[in-house]
């Protein structure tokens, strides 16, 4: 809505039609912002600026985790802090399980992608220099600090992360928690 431009609002999971995620903001804007940027760039900018206004909280989260850059939360509350609950109900198994979805670090990549897509759609270099570029750089710094070099393969890997399937937080029979390189 055009009214969003005046608000400090993000794109909540499931839009406005479900209570399952309590209005938290995830990465769902990655699916809609590229189109919004082409049709109503002022709304796209406002929604990405929502993330920019929470950049200091994301930097603090990265620092607390011993990382550089900006660590955006998987479930962001209104102030930008991580709001992922400790337990998750699995409707397939009918059991509660630990909710490790806070390991879904790709939310930052979605934010950086949306910032770049907004710039490409609008050509707004001033916005990119003042806000969008800062988001892109800080997310890049985070992933550079997450990556570890494997000298045996001469490749970089990211361990302990989780893909977008919140019910599968690790590969079967693998040591440790999370996934390697966001793959199953």
Model features per residue range: what roles?
Residues 115-133, 147:
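Inter-helical turn/loop segments and adjacent helix faces that build the functional surface
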Residues 45-48, 129, 137:
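Conserved positions within tetratricopeptide repeat
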Residues 17-28, 100-110, 128-135, 154, ...:
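Secondary-structure capping and boundary motifs in well-ordered enzyme cores
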Residues 1-123:
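Substrate-binding groove/exosite segments of carbohydrate-active enzymes
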Residues 110, 117, 136-146:
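Structured mid-domain segments that build the active-site/substrate or prosthetic-cofactor binding neighborhood
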Residues 6-12, 63-65, 127-131, 148-159:
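Short, glycine/acidic-rich hinge or "gate" loops at secondary-structure transitions
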Residues 142-184:
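Acidic/histidine-rich catalytic neighborhood
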């Amino acid at each position: 809505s055009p009214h969003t431009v005046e608000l400090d609002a993000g794109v909540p999971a499931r839009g406005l039609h479900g209570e399952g995620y309590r209005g938290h903001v995830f990465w769902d804007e990655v699916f809609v912002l590229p189109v919004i940027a082409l049709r109503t760039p002022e709304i796209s900018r406002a929604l990405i600026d929502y993330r920019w206004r929470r950049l200091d909280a994301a930097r603090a989260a990265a620092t607390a985790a011993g990382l550089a850059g900006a660590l955006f939360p998987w479930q962001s509350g209104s102030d930008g802090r991580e709001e992922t609950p400790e337990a998750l109900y699995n409707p397939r198994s009918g059991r509660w399980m630990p909710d490790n979805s806070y390991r879904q670090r790709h939310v930052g990549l979605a934010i950086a992608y949306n910032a770049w897509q907004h710039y490409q759609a609008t050509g707004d270099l001033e916005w990119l220099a003042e806000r969008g570029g800062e988001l892109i750089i800080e997310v890049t710094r985070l992933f550079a600090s997450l990556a570890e070099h494997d000298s045996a393969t001469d490749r970089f890997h990211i361990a302990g992360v989780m893909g977008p399937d919140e019910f599968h937080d690790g590969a079967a029979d693998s040591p440790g928690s999370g996934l390697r390189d966001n793959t199953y």
